[in-house]
């Protein structure tokens, strides 16, 4: 079975078994809702166990999560640095024009027929996602995921067609 990263446990939060998680999922409310089952992987990417979410809340840039059956800091301290993943069979079907991060990362970005680079990361700074495009011999390009810029996402051909607005590429 294939698993996809949804967050990394970066620290404990208080004494009641809560953990500070740095989320890397595109559907936070769905992934961390009460009753959701996630897989826990250690620093060597080895499966440890399935865990059930008992509670979730946001605090600044972190998701604060508590696992069912783990109610004290001593129960969870050993999991700092571990990764939370979702099984592929738990992914929901998406509407047209919506994508999971793992589908977008690695796609080639083209303006016309020219390959600009490959998407290496997705940022969520505000209203729109920003795709980080790794380019050969140039600085990374920050590409806003908005209709005038991203014209087409073709998953079957591993290709994103874009039109760079003036000022987006400061190296031209």
UniProtKB/Swiss-Prot annotation:
Q: Which SUPFAM superfamilies match?
A: PRC-barrel domain (SSF50346), Translation proteins (SSF50447)
Q: Which UniProt keywords apply?
A: Chaperone, Cytoplasm, Ribosome biogenesis, rRNA processing
Q: Which GO terms describe its cellular component?
A: cytoplasm; ribosome
Question: A Pfam family this protein belongs to?
Answer: RimM
Single GO biological process annotation from the record:
ribosomal small subunit biogenesis
User: Gene3D superfamilies recorded for this chain?
Assistant: PRC-barrel domain, RimM
MF GO annotations? ribosome binding
What note about domains is in the entry? The PRC barrel domain binds ribosomal protein uS19.
- Protein name according to UniProt: Ribosome maturation factor RimM
């Amino acid at each position: 079975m294939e698993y996809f990263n949804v967050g990394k446990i970066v620290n404990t939060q208080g004494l009641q078994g809560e953990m500070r998680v740095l989320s890397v999922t595109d559907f936070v409310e769905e992934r961390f809702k009460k009753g959701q089952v996630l897989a826990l992987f250690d620093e060597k990417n080895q499966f440890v166990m399935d865990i059930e979410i008992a509670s979730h809340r946001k605090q600044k840039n972190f998701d604060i999560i508590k696992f069912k059956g783990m109610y004290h800091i001593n129960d969870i301290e050993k999991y700092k640095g571990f990764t939370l993943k979702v099984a592929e069979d738990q992914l929901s079907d998406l509407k047209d024009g919506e994508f999971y991060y793992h589908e977008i990362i690695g796609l080639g970005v083209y303006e016309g027929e020219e390959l600009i680079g490959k998407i290496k990361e997705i940022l969520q700074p505000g209203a729109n996602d920003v795709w980080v495009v790794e380019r050969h011999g140039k600085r990374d390009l920050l590409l806003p995921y908005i209709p005038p810029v991203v014209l087409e996402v073709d998953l079957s051909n591993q290709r994103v067609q874009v039109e760079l607005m003036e000022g987006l590429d400061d190296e031209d």
